Amino acid sequence: MVSTSNGSDPLTIGGRLFSCRLLTGTGKYPSINSMQSSIERSACEMVTVAVRRVQTGAAGHTGLMEAIDWSRIWMLPNTAGCTNAEEAIRVARLGRELAKLAGQEDNNFIKLEVIPDSRHLLPDPIGTLQAAEALVKEGFTVLPYINADPLLAQRLEEVGCATVMPLGSPIGSGQGLNNAANIALIIENATVPVVVDAGIGVPSEAAQAMEMGADAVLVNSAIALAGDPPSMAEAMGKAVIAGRMAYSSGRLPRRGQASASSPTTGLISGKDK
């Protein structure tokens, strides 16, 4: 199992502290056992659960609630499958009840997804903002999934969201950080944690997001659909730790020309022979 990140550098969301900055999902795994092992080896402390799929017993979600140790893992219910704000609000309420059934009575977290387009799976900015405003008023800790739109991120922060979760690229695409420039702007301006969500395909991309200054990443498809999900989960966990350490250490400034790493004084010249 990967050791979690430095305990002196916790991730704080909604007043709750997490020592691991990798969030994972529960969908698309080849088996429940594969999911369990992946969660364990990633060292993650928060996993997202699709409320609708658990409620309906969708493929891959039967027995999910019993398969995870909810005394150790914080549940992040999500509103996947919701196409408008009204649906998302209803499913968020069900998600809160689901967390209570898992023994997390004080869990008001919700990963807000409003996605009307089933082909491209891009989030609806207007519906997301509408649902976020309503859910914050109901006492939810809202983690909204959004396009990498700096202005929308700012507005969601203003209405009281606990994080913003810009996508790197479309869900499940494995295209990496196609929106790196906008994500960098969001990170620069945000006063809440920025969690890069969707599109990460390999550990180097998770590390890249962390090196940019993201507070965390959420990775599901890249782990669940890997040839060896538990090994990929461990690799992602290590990449997130490395990326965070690199960001905290401060990178070498970029220069327009070379700079010798060896001293240029005291060199032996031809005259010294």
Swiss-Prot record:
Gene3D superfamilies: Aldolase class I (3.20.20.70). 1-deoxy-D-xylulose 5-phosphate binds at residues 172, 198-199, 220-221. Transmembrane segments: none annotated. It is found in: Cytoplasm. Residues 251-273 are annotated as: Disordered. The keyword Phosphoprotein does not apply. Residues 258-267 have a biased composition (Polar residues). PANTHER family: THIAZOLE SYNTHASE. It holds the Pfam family ThiG. Coiled coil: none annotated. GO terms for cellular component: cytoplasm. Its EC number is 2.8.1.10. Pathway: Cofactor biosynthesis; thiamine diphosphate biosynthesis. InterPro entries: Aldolase_TIM, Thiazole_synthase_ThiG, ThiG. This is Thiazole synthase. Belongs to the ThiG family. Its main location: cytoplasm. Keywords: Cytoplasm, Schiff base, Thiamine biosynthesis, Transferase. It comes from the Bacteria. Homotetramer. Forms heterodimers with either ThiH or ThiS. The keyword Aminoacyl-tRNA synthetase does not apply. GO terms for biological process: thiamine diphosphate biosynthetic process.
